[in-house]
Amino acid sequence: AATRDHPHAGMQISPDQGQLLALLVKLIGAGRTIEVGTFTGYSALTVALALPDDGRLLACDVSDDYTRVGRPFWQQAGVAHKIELVLAPALQTLDARLATGAAGTFDFAFIDADKVNYDGYYERCLALLRSGGLIAFDNTLWGGAVARPAQTDDTAALQGLNDKLHHDERIDLAMLTVGDGLSLARKR
């Protein structure tokens, strides 16, 4: 209810997306995961619940106010020990992980943050993922706006990302009509 009743609840993933993310994490046997854009913590909670007890989620966000909503629920669900919340620009956080030699050590990433940086998040998460790892992108249909001439920078960024993913030979791709569009990219 805390997320559902939040003034910006529309930014949160849908319950069916949460169920799908949890299933994907389990299907690939993920142990180390990344989330770019935590908002009120619902997607972090669903991923953390799907992880084994020694699994870890690196949650990247810039808002203490938004993430503060979800932190008590992580505690109540018994998964707070799995979640490392880093409050800083995600590109900076991901670059820092790459600089410490973490390339190829993560299994799963979920990207749901500022759309204009999706390409940067993609490149860094792809570098951090192992072969066979999976990246899930939220909002890739963008209310259907990606099928029309771009009216905003966000729409243009998502159109560019969708085109890039479609032609990227480093991945296998599926775009699902779950929520506002959920694209799945498996690193080859």
Q: Each predicted region: which residue ranges?
A:
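Rossmann-like AdoMet
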Residues: A1-Q12
